[in-house]
Amino acid sequence: MAGGVTGGGSATWSDRFEQGLHPAIERFNASIGFDITLLQEDLDGSIAHARMLADCGVIQVEEADQLVGGLEQVRQEAASGLFQPGLADEDVHFAVERRLIALLGPVGKKLHTGRSRNDQVGTDLRLWLRRRLDELEQHLLGFQRALLDQANLHSNTLIPGYTHLQRAQPLCLAHHLLAYVEMVERDRQRMADLRKRLNLSPLGAAALAGTPVPIDRRSTASALGFDGIYANSLDAVSDRDFTVEFSAAASLVMVHLSRLAEEVIFWASEECGFVRLTDRCATGSSLMPQKKNPDVPELVRGKCGRVFGHLQGLLTMIKGLPLAYNKDFQEDKEALFDVVATTSQCLEAMTILLQEGLSFRTERLEAAVAADYSNATDVADYLVAKQVPFREAYQLVGAVVKHCLQEGVLLRELTLERWQQFHPAIEADLFEALTPRNVVAARTSEGGTGFDRVNEQLAIWNQRFGLADQVF
């Protein structure tokens, strides 16, 4: 162990071994470089385990008090930078135990009674991820709130809607942003749902078969905030479903972030120009002084590959493992740690982008929705209201659009006389129906982009976020 109060020494193996590990294999085998991330959880689990051993009469109360005191001292040493595990510790569990024995002597050797590193690491990892879920929930809520704030600002703003990245129908911009609010809500629900399966304690399952030591697994589960225990000891130490399930849920978060990121990149392009990037969230070019680059959404879009890759890696790692514990499981931690870190960073970055990094160019948006044929469907709807069968109306409007393209005019620029040459049912009120605002307002079906419907949804979301005094 290098330079810390924990000292050095060989691994904690039995006398079955006559030789030490080859130095290269020792480096290859060790996980202390990354699983030290689990230190706080390892200490919490060990404290609960020590108290349970005393409650069950396995060790003396005084010994449990000594163990708890020693574990808290390790926590303090870690906070002050004095606790510095090294390669010889192999992992966080041995590092803590070695220091505890150095502090307490023979009493420190009693801590591992009735447990194995197999159930210990499973406990640590679940405790760690549970805490990260709480933090991710706040990131998701913050991102939702940033989307909602923008939606409240633009409840009366229009934006072109697209299918196949071709202009389709005009939308209320708030409606577009609320679509992402809904996506994030599903993300939050998925995280909450997986927590139910995550929050079971494997502690006390020991290596794989349980233990003859008279322990109380439910006591430690309760002390650590778990909802219950694994019913099968073999399953308890073999299960890494929660790492896959979380990474899959995080991958969907990244999908949603990436879809918005792609739209922001498109909206910020000179060809589109729907948003203006601020200096707070954009970068320049080392060669071209006129450039303002959308690095934040581009990085978010790119970082999806990391999260997706970790998900695939976890699936591949687990798929061929026989029960119970296998060293392959060591590979779950760096993947899981990076999924959490990357997803959290991307949520934070996109939240800041929405809050400080962009503004919508409403004049450009208004001009865009007025300069295309995205109101063509409304001509068909108009004719349907005049008792023209929809498919007939659809074919007719296609012919009208073709004519307009050939003549270089918009639908609203045709004269009433020319319209009536296409169909006699058309009257002067068609022109009012074709204005972009009326096109949007007409979408009054529940969940539609009509202003009244959008305001209903804004009111619901504002109430959820305590913003019920918003005026649209």
Curated annotation (Swiss-Prot):
Protein known as: Argininosuccinate lyase
BP GO annotations: arginine biosynthetic process via ornithine; L-arginine biosynthetic process
Keywords of this entry: Amino-acid biosynthesis, Arginine biosynthesis, Cytoplasm, Lyase
GO cellular component: cytosol
Catalysis: reaction(s): 2-(N(omega)-L-arginino)succinate = fumarate + L-arginine
Single GO MF descriptor: argininosuccinate lyase activity
Top-rank lineage group of the source organism: Bacteria
Source species: Synechococcus sp. (strain CC9311)
Keyword Lyase: yes
Family matches, as Pfam families: ASL_C2, Lyase_1
Catalytic EC class: lyase
Compartment annotation: Cytoplasm
Family membership noted in the UniProt record: Belongs to the lyase 1 family. Argininosuccinate lyase subfamily.
